[in-house]
Amino acid sequence: MFDYTIIILGGDEMLVDEIWDFKSINMGRELEISGEFIYESAKKTMSITGLNNQYEINIILYTGAVGIERLQKIYLCLVLQNPTDKESVPKCLVEHNHHELEKEIEKYTTEQLSKNGRSLLGVFSNYYNNYRYANYIPGKNSSELRKLFISFLKKQNGKFNFDEPCALIQFDAFKRFYINELGKLARYYFELIEHKARDINTYTYEIDSYSNAARVFLSTQRRSFYEQMVIEQNSIKELLLYMYKNKRESGAFRLLNDMESLEMDDALVNDYLADLCEGKVNNWLIDYVDELYEEMEDIKKRKERKELLALIGNRSVLFDFDDFEDDENESYHRNMFESDDIEGGENL
C-alpha cells in the first residue's frame, strides 16, 4: 500500500496527495471558471456602442475583475505549500484586492506587469471594492463608475471627449484597447500559472480546448484577444454567407428550403445581423416574430412551424445527407417527427 506523507500546518493535517489534487484538479477548474468570466467581459465589450448604460459597464468590469482575481489566487495557491491552511495563507488570498494580490505574487516571480496591466488592475480593484454594490448606497453618484472606466480608456487616447457623440468606428478603437489589455493581463497570469504548475508537476494549466477559457488563454498565443473576438464574429458571417449562396438539397438545407420565411423589413436586417454576431437577439426582431405568431389564425399551421423550427440547430436531430428519391419527398416532414425527443404543440 502507498505510504502517504502527512504535512502538518497550523494544526491541520493534510495528505500530500490531497494537496496535489487541490492544486491540480481544483485549481484547474478555477482556471476554466476564470476564463469564462474574462471571456464574458470581452464579449460584452464587443456588443456595446457607447458608455451610456451603467449596467453594461458594470458587467464588463465585474466579469473582468472576478476573472483576473481568480487567476491571481490560483497562482498563489500553487506557490504556497499548503494553500488550504487558513492560519498560514496571506490575508490577501481571502480578501478582494487586486493590488495586494499582485504584491504577494511579486514575491515569487521576477516577471513584471506592464504599465497598462497595472493600471487595469487598479480599475478592477477600485470597481470591486467601491462600485460593485454602489446602487445599494443612497446618494452614490452613478456617473463615477463611467468616469472610472473612462480613466482607463483614455490611456488609448487622452484627448478623446467621451461626453460628445462619436461614430461607432471611433469607439471601436477603445473597445479594442480594453479587450487587448484584458487579454494581455489574463495571458500574463496564465503563463505564471502554467510555469509554476509544470515546476511542481501538476496539470493545472490543462483546460478544455473547446471552452471559452481556451479562447482566452490559448488562442491569444497566436493572435490578440480582440482579433479572437473578431474571428468569432467573422465565422458567423461566413456561415450566413455560405447558407445564403449555396442552395443545397441535403441535410438542414432541405428543411430550410421547404419552409416558408416570414416577411422581414430589409432595412432592419443588418441591425439583426449585428446583434446576432455579438451573441444576442435583437429586441425588435423578438417582438416582431412574437406578433406574427399571434396573428397566425391557423393554430395547426403555427404548431407545425414551431415543430420544424425546433429541428434547426437541434443537436439531437440527425439529418439525412443522402439524396432523396422523388417519391420520398412527400413523407420528408412526417419522417422527421418520428423521434420521441421532439415535443409538439404550443409548448415549443
What are the functions of these language-model segments?
Residues 209-348:
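Charge-dense, extended regions
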Residues 2-4:
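Aromatic (phenylalanine/tyrosine) cluster motif
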Residues 131, 144, 163-169, 348:
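Intrinsically disordered, low-complexity segments enriched in charged and polar residues
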Residues 66-70:
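Long, contiguous alpha-helical bundle segments
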Residues 73-150:
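Short non-catalytic regulatory patches outside canonical folded cores
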Residues 44, 48, 107, 111, ...:
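Surface-exposed polar/charged interaction patches
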Residues 9-64, 75, 79-93:
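Charged alpha-helical initiation segments
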Residues 150-212:
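Amphipathic, Lys/Arg-enriched alpha-helical patches that create a basic surface
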